[in-house]
Amino acid sequence: MFLEYSKLSNSLNLNSKSHTSASNEESGSHHDHHHSSDEHNGSFDPHIWLNPELTKQIAEVIYQQLTIQYPALKSQFKQNLDDFVSQLSIAEQKIANQFGAQKPLSIYTFHQAFTHFAEHYGLHIEGTITRTPEARPGAKHLSELSKEIQQKSKICLVKEPNFKAPYINSIASETEVVFTTADPLATTIENSPKGYIDFIHSIADSFYQCFE
């Protein structure tokens, strides 16, 4: 079930840096990842499902909408919601424990997809390779980014499996780089009741490789 953005955004407490249309994350369904130019201006990050707390709010909105459309199934929807929130809370704590003892590290991502995840778990993303994944970044941006990275002794660079960007390897030639890959689209995650739990663990495991 997909909800109109206007209905969802009015129902969510989006106190972080960005807003977006939402998909049914409770069922682990995937979404269309087309980005308009407006979506990548400033600090916009539409990937709100990467913050588990916002995902709980999304699940609550979905529950409310489902009970309106199918009132006879309200008790089953409520049980599903409670189970999902409980499982997600357990996953959140496990992930928080993963990152809790790690020393600060400069993290760069391919594009602005992981802001919500990083903020939720206290990780610091210092920069992105490109604002929009569909277009190659400009030479000026790559040059400035390369100079910035060269001043650091070690960074972690988070790639994405759906986009090839060979220029990534050249911008940090004189810096120790830990490469990892994270998929904000959950393209390899099975669409199942625990799909979102598996998904958020996969993102956490990818970022944890930065510290290994």
Predicted segments — roles?
Residues 1-212:
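Extracytoplasmic metal-acquisition and chelation regions
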